[in-house]
Structures are given as structure tokens and as C-alpha cells.
Amino acid sequence: METLRIMSGKIVIKGAREHNLQNVDLELPRDKFIVITGISGSGKSSLAFDTIYAEGQRRYVESLSAYARQFLGQMKKPEMDYIEGLSPAISIDQKTTRVNPRSTVGTITEIYDYLRLLFARIGKPHCYLCGREIEQQTSTQIVDRIMDDGEGERIIILAPVVRDRKGEHQRVFERLREQGFVRVRVDGEIHDLEDEFDLDRNRKHSIDVVVDRLVVRRDTEFRKRLADSVETALQLGEGTVRVPSTMTPGEERIYSEHFACPGTAGINFEEISPRMFSFNSPHGACPECNGLGSKLEIDPDLVVPYPERSINEGAIVPWSKSGKRDNYYHQMLRAVAEHYGFSLDTPFRDLDEEHRRAILYGTDEKIQFVFQRKNRTYRVNRRFEGVIPRMERIYMETKSNYMRTYIGRFMSNHACPVCGGSRLRPESLSVTINGRSIHDVVEMSIREAHEFFDSLKLTEREEYIAREVLKEIRERLRFLIDVGLDYLTLSRSSGTLSGGEAQRIRLATQIGSGLVGVLYILDEPSIGLHQRDNRRLIETLKRLRDLGNTLIVVEHDEETILSADHVVDIGPGAGEHGGCVVAEGTPEEIMEDPDSLTGAYLSGRETIPLPEVRRRPSGRYLTVRGAAENNLREIDVRIPLGLFTCVTGVSGSGKSTLVNDILYRGVYERLNHKHMNAGRHTDIEGLQHIDKVVMIDQSPIGRTPRSNPATYTGVFTHIRELFAQTPEARKRGYRPGRFSFNVKGGRCEACGGDGIIKIEMHFLADVYVPCEVCRGRRYNEETLEIRYRGRNIAEVLDMTVEEALEFFENIPQVRRKLQTLYDVGLGYIKLGQPATTLSGGEAQRVKLAKELSRRSTGSTLYILDEPTTGLHFDDIKKLLNVLGRLVDAGNTAVVIEHNLDVIKSADHIIDLGPEGGERGGLVVAEGTPEEVAASGTHTGRFLREVLADERSQKVPVGQDTG
């Protein structure tokens, strides 16, 4: 039956009921580009990821053995009747790659693996000391070099036969015995071959055969014996000889028939292999930083974040946490001050350099310390260790996780002083192709790397050797360019990628794999992508389809929807009001369907209108001076206060660096006097006009099911107080804490207030069942007996915001908070809905609602990074209304955005560019949308088209916001 479905070209879904899906029946065409759209919370992800992908993945995992299944994340069977016609499913979602410091763009895409192979095969090694190209050594040259040693020195001639390979290697020992050898060196220790060897087969071992043991002499007889031994060692060691010195333990020279420096430096290389260029292998990794490229060290700027303070005012933060002036550390500093003759009341930055250095790094001079404790005085003469060395010592020696975490707050990553951040050994960095090392190549932008390999000049022999490797490298670089990531470098750490960038990298990797007959499910691949690059992304998706794959894309981007072969519109509302297929068919059929809200926006029946009037600058500005982090080119940026400002620009132009790394962190540091490691800039002016800065992003409002909209917005506190004031609760002496499921007393102790019990199934998916004691209600029976207007606390948490708004209409402090949730379009979510089940867009709107419910000071700076992620046209209209309310109250909103509906609605635009990466980092246009549209920038060009479609005349500029 399944085979027939696949041959008939359809994926058939019957009775899908996962989450809010309402018994959905659907037939999707195979080998097509399908878009699933609908408003936030309508059930798109429930259909695409939690039903179609989950079932495809579950069936694959079930085909494996029970032993293998226990090591894989088994997915639970979705709520549905059946699905037919599924192919193997691959999900490419918005989740960022794992924050592994060893993971880079190059390793994720496997381009770095091909680069390692390329450099190993055609790279030219150089001496990293003198710079000369490495030459091969003959056995005669090796003998000459050994003869140069001092007469009388004892040496051993070793031939490496096993290098870092797992196994017991018994056959190696037998072969050496048969050849008449007497001794071997195993893992650095000399043994007789007659010994019994019991090596751990799961560990890597190195074995060298002892060919000869000699005392260096200058005569002919010695030279002949040495030459014979070297020839034998070269034969056994496949061209490599090791000569450890018995007079200097640990010193060992390596001679090779393959690579050795012809100059006086005498540098010798082992055979050049791909692992020599891997920073994850001891053969390639820098020994100082172990291939990380950076070292975690105590940062003086974090130890003394506010040098304008004196030591008595707490300048040395880690030694001031108690706030007491008579503590142990303060007594030490007082002794240092008395010894050197400076005052603890002098601002730290005004102290002499010698005194600052003595405080931070210690002194060689002995100082008399006087310690007072429990009315006793102790005197001791000793050297002062210094704040930073003491912290480093405690960090290394302590077994306390708390102490390591605390000291970790004062540490930051610095480029490794040995490799300079390249991660590799000097030998690896000295191998070049066309004058470029592998580090030089990965530091290029992807576009520059593509141009480098396209124009590579090789000999005929090198071209023949590298043909297939170069083909793979060029293709994969081209795929990354096609998905709009040409500005990234191959060395970029995966942990610094946005969700959209990480997803498009995985997309490019999948295209490179060339798989056919696969079901790909993508989550908004257009996020983070400028309109200029959107067309290339769509062409890439079509190429993946044309290979013979089915693409299901959850998307809201208009151009992507219109480019699809088939569109499914889920709705009509969100939550309980959604979960149905409102319309499906070609984009044209969707546009003509009167029931489709998406179709109404696509056809122009519904629009996000331009604002009637734009707010005018009040003359007050927040000015960032000398922004120079990442690719920003020491720019000054003026942000008008009291306005809705959009920061735009092509991908990689520097928007996130400017707004998140510099503006948000810089303002937060200054307003809250807490170090946030802000990006490089000179100053931020105009802070006297704002009292706080708030970042409203799409991160979850909580990491556990205990967190929910009611607890996050604070409305649950008022609700618990209401229950505590009921006559029955007062009679029993119940306080508000009784109605919390986070503390003992009122919660069900069988499930700890979770309402569910987790049952581990090992090789099957974990099963979550309702608690048998409280039946999923979280509270014990005594607590549930307390009722407010006929409802107990569990029933109130099960209400939607819409229902609760009506229920609490006479309680102002509850109604006000619920009203803001309703106003941002979240009337359908339940008060007690676990935070883990909220989408990114829903979480962001809960945060917006919380801000709206606060009593406005009119002086808050709100920062949002791509708030339209996961939002439908209709959701964006609601978002703009909410942002308008915040700004109308006198606050300032700064939004990073690519969505043209948001950009056209802004009061002010700051456009960065002109391109991404090194070709970006400048302010290329600023002003009203009309003024930016008149510029020649990429954003201006697309904005001009949108404004021309909407209305021909300019939007009038309104009154001053101040």
C-alpha cells in the first residue's frame, strides 16, 4: 500500500490531532515545493514538524535494532489515524547549532575536511623559522646531521612502526622478533621484545623499534655503522627515523626522507597528512590552546570594570562581594597600600601603573600583613600573590562548582598567544598553496574563498591530483553563496550563528550531499535574509526539489509563498480557534479563496497600511560613537529618541553587532553598572534621556513546564492572592503560597507540581502520563477545594486568556495584565500553558505584553531583533500596533528587521552596508522610509517598490515626539 502511495505521488494524512490540529485530512503532492502558512499558533509546526517529520523520523528509528534505538532520540507517535507515502525525513529548523567551540562553518559544511585533504596532497611545506621551502632528505643527509652531534653523545636510532593507532598490535611484535630485533619503545618506554605485551585495544599506541644504540664518533667505521642503521630504520619506518638523546631526556629529533628544512634551522616534518591540518587532532592542534584558538583567562577589565571607583568603593569586584571593609581580602589590600604608600580612597585608574600592577599581579617584595579575627591579631611577612594569580589558583584547585562559576564570571577568551587564534601548529600553518596557508583560506569570506579557488594556478600534476577535491570545494562554496551566506568566513564559530544562518548552512550542506527521494521540512529559511538574497534562496530550494525531493516549508514570506508549487493555509485562528486547513492549492487558488486570510493579504484585499502620519524627531538622540566591533568601521550612529527606528541592511552588514553587541550591552552596562562585555565603541551619548533598556527577543519565557504566561506576566501572583482572600482559605489559614505549584504545601507532592510523570522507556521514546494522584491538576485535594466564583485554581489555569478576561473583569490589576495579552493577539493561549510549548513568536508577544502592562516611564529603550520571525501578515499588523503603543507612550523602539511591511511603517531607518562582511559596516542611508527609498542602497531599491505600490504621495510627517 505504502509503495503504491509513493508511486501515485502523494503523501496522505488522515485524522491528524497533534496539539491543536482538529482531525486534519490532507493530501500533499510528492516531489514538489510545498509551503505551509497561517497565523502564529494556528498549527503549522504541529502539522509539519510534530506530525509529518515526527512520524517519518519515528519510522526510520523503529527500523533499527532495539540496541541502536536506545542511543537515539526516539520521537513519540503523533496523534493521528495514519500517514501514507512518507519518504525518509530530514528536518532543517531554526535551532542554532550546538555551541561547540570546535565547530565552525567549515567543519559543519565539510569544506574544511576537503581543505585538509587538498593541503595534504598539493601543499608546499615551508620552514616556519626561516621561511624556506622544505626539501626531502636523503639517508646521506640524515647521517651527516647526526654526525654533527657532539662526540661522545649517546643516541638511539628508532624506526616508527605504529603511530597513534588503536589495537593490541601482537602481530607487529611477532614480526619484529622474527626479523631479529631485540628492543622496542612502546608509548615512550623501552622494553625487551621477549617481554609479554598486553596493550589496551581501545587506546591509541605508538611503537618504535630500536635499530641501534650508539655513541657518536668521527671515524669511518662509526659512519658506516650509522649509515647501515639509518638505512634499516628508514626502511622499517617508511622514510622516517627518530633519534632521541639519552643525555637530554625528552629531546627527540625526527628525520625524514620526505621533508626537512635545508637551512640552519633544521626543522623536520613528519609526513604531511590531512590530520596535520585538523585542530581536533593532536597532530595538528596548537599544543598551547589544544586547537581552540583561544584561552580562557582572568580578564583585568572584568576584575576592575569601573576604574573610576576606589578600592574602598569596590573597584575590585571579586574581592568586594561581601561589602565589608574588615574582610580578609580588604585587610590584605590595606597592607599592600601601606607598604607602597598609596590610598585605598584613590580612584583605581589614578593609581601609579606600578601600584595597579602590584594589586592585580602581585609582588616579589615581602609585605607585613596584619589580620584581625575574633578580637585576635595575626602578623605575617610574605609576598603578595596578587588578585588575578590568586583567582587563577583557586579556579584550578577548587572542587566547588559554585566557586568555579563565580570566578568564571571574571574570565574571557583571549586569542592564543602561540597560534594567534589559528588553532594549528606552526608546521601546519607553514604549508601553503599559491602562497596561502589553510588558516589564510578559512579567514577569507566565502565569496573571497570561492574567487581564490576559481583563480587557483596549479601545475599539470597538481591539477590532476586535486581535480576532484577542488570540484567539491567550489560546489559547496557556491551553494553557500546561493543561500545568501557569502559574507561568512569558514572559520566562523557555529555558536555565533543566528538561527537563520545555521539553517541555511544545513540547507547548503544537504544540497551538497546530493540526496534524492528525501522529504525535507524547513522552518522559515528566509529569516535573517535580505530581500536581495531571497530570490537566490528560492532558486536553491527549487534546485533541491528538482533533484527529486519533496520540500515542506513553514513560511510567511510573500515571495516564497508565491514561488511554491502548492500552498496549505492553516487557521482560521490560533490555538483552539485554529488547527484546520482553511485553503490549499496553487498560490493563485489561495489568493482567490475568500476564506483564506493569507490569500487576502497576497491578493491585496487585506494590507498592512502605511502609517497615517510619521512621528518627527524631538531633537533628542542616543548616539553611538566609534562603533568598531567585527566589521563595523568606526562609525557614529544617531538614534532619535521617542521614535520607532528600523536598522536594516543586507545579511552580514553589521546590524546585530551594532544593535545587540554595542547598543544594548553598552547602554545596559552604563545604566545598571554591570559589565556585559559590550562590543568595541568609543562612547554612547544621550543616556540621560532613558532610564532602562529592555531586549525583547524570541527566546523562551522559561526553560521548564513550570513557567507559563501567568507566572511570567505576574498575573498569577494576583490570582493566588484572590484565592487566599476567599472565606474558606482564610478560615483554613491558607496564604498565597498555598496556591503555588512550585513550593510544598498546596501542590501535589506525587508529581512535584508538574501534573505529569515521566516514565523512561530506554530504547523507546520516554512516556509522559498524567499524575494518578492529582490527575494532571498539579495541586492536592485540599487546595482544590478552595473556589473563587465557583472555580478552583487548576480550572483558572486551564482558562484561555479570552475566558479569563471575562472571568476577572471586575479585578482591575488582573484584567489590565490579561488585556495586554489579548491585545497582542494571544487571547487563545491558556494561562497555565507550559512555556516550552510556546512558539518563538508567542514567547516574544508574551514579553511585549508584560512590558505593555507596566506603568510606563516614557523613557525606556526597547530593542527587538527580527520580531517578525514566525509571524503571519496579520500577526505583523498586531505587532506594529503594540510597538506603536509603546512608542506613543514616549518610549524608543529599535528593531532589526528585513520585513518590508515593518520597515515601511518605521519613523526612522538606519541602513547599513553596502554589502556583507568586510564590504559592510557603514551607514549607507538614514532617514524616513521615503528618504531611504530615494537612495541607491539595496534596501532603498526594494522599499521604493513597496511604497510605490501602496501610495504615490509621501506620508506626512507629524508633530514632534517631545
Swiss-Prot record:
CDD domains: ABC_UvrA_I (cd03270), ABC_UvrA_II (cd03271)
Cellular component annotations (GO), alphabetically ordered: cytoplasm; excinuclease repair complex
Xref: PROSITE patterns: ABC_TRANSPORTER_1, ABC_TRANSPORTER_2
Amino-acid positions noted as binding ATP in the UniProt annotation, renumbered to this chain: 38-45, 649-656
Molecular functions per Gene Ontology: ATP binding; ATP hydrolysis activity; DNA binding; excinuclease ABC activity; zinc ion binding
Main location, first listed in the record: cytoplasm
Claim: Repeat is one of the keywords in the record: yes
C4-type zinc-finger residues: 748-774
Annotated ranges, domain ABC transporter: 319-597, 617-944
InterPro entries: AAA+_ATPase, ABC_transporter-like_ATP-bd, ABC_transporter-like_CS, ATP_grasp_subdomain_1, P-loop_NTPase, UvrA, UvrA_DNA-bd, UvrA_inter
UniProt keyword list: ATP-binding, Cytoplasm, DNA damage, DNA excision, DNA repair, DNA-binding, Excision nuclease, Metal-binding, Nucleotide-binding, Repeat, SOS response, Zinc, Zinc-finger
UniProt record, GO biological process: nucleotide-excision repair; SOS response
Localization per Swiss-Prot or TrEMBL: Cytoplasm
Assembly with partners or alone: Forms a heterotetramer with UvrB during the search for lesions.
Protein family: Belongs to the ABC transporter superfamily. UvrA family.
Physiological role: The UvrABC repair system catalyzes the recognition and processing of DNA lesions. UvrA is an ATPase and a DNA-binding protein. A damage recognition complex composed of 2 UvrA and 2 UvrB subunits scans DNA for abnormalities. When the presence of a lesion has been verified by UvrB, the UvrA molecules dissociate.
Protein name as catalogued: UvrABC system protein A
Originating organism: Methanothermobacter thermautotrophicus (strain ATCC 29096 / DSM 1053 / JCM 10044 / NBRC 100330 / Delta H)
Gene behind the chain: uvrA
